Design a protein with these regions (language model features):
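Conserved NTP-donor binding/palm subdomain of two-metal-ion nucleotidyltransferases/polymerases, i.e.
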Residues: 1-60, 66-176
Length: 176
């Protein structure tokens, strides 16, 4: 009785969060320049591909990656379409711009989904980092979608990177 109710509630909440993420992806597809290849990463990529590992997720953000040379153009398009970065101090802004693998988190007004716009999958300061150009050579098309995803082996590599570089061990084991 009670446990079954909790499980049904969790499944419904997961379905809701997945739908919210899909709505955000649709808005992003309209906002980003069509000529810029955009890669969906991590959980949003699993959902986009309808992978088994996507089931039961509670997505709260979407991670996208563009080539470094397309970063300013993609950011400008997002800002022009209403996304805005969190207010951060000059030190943190410089950190994101010079040393991180992503821009400061962005959000669209009225949306609960945070957007992380990456230009590679590991921080610039990471000891081990993949050749981002190679990641872009094996991108996979998701049928009927504007977005691309990493090659399945690169998705595993990315999950492994997060497993060993992040502190959220349990969630990252599931992704791997």
């Amino acid at each position: 009785g009670c446990v079954l109710g909790h499980l049904r509630s969790a499944a419904a909440y997961s379905a809701h969060r997945t739908q919210v993420l899909r709505v955000e992806l649709a808005a992003l597809a309209k906002a980003l320049p069509a000529e810029v290849p955009v890669v969906v990463l991590k959980g949003a990529a699993y959902i986009l591909q309808d992978l088994e590992s996507a089931r039961g997720r509670l997505p709260g953000d979407v991670d996208l990656m563009v080539a470094y040379d397309d970063l300013k153009r993609a950011e400008a398009a997002l800002l022009g379409a209403g996304w805005a970065a969190e207010e951060i101090n000059a030190y943190d802004q410089r950190y994101y711009r010079e040393w991180s693998h992503e821009l400061p988190p962005m959000r669209r007004p009225g949306s609960s989904v945070e957007l992380d716009l990456h230009h590679t999958i590991t921080p610039v300061t990471a000891r081990l980092k993949p050749d981002t150009a190679l990641l872009f050579t094996d991108l996979q098309v998701v049928e009927g979608k504007r977005f691309l995803v990493l090659h399945p082996q690169d998705q595993i590599l990315h999950a492994a990177v997060h497993l060993f570089q992040d502190s959220e061990l349990f969630a990252n084991l599931r992704d791997l």
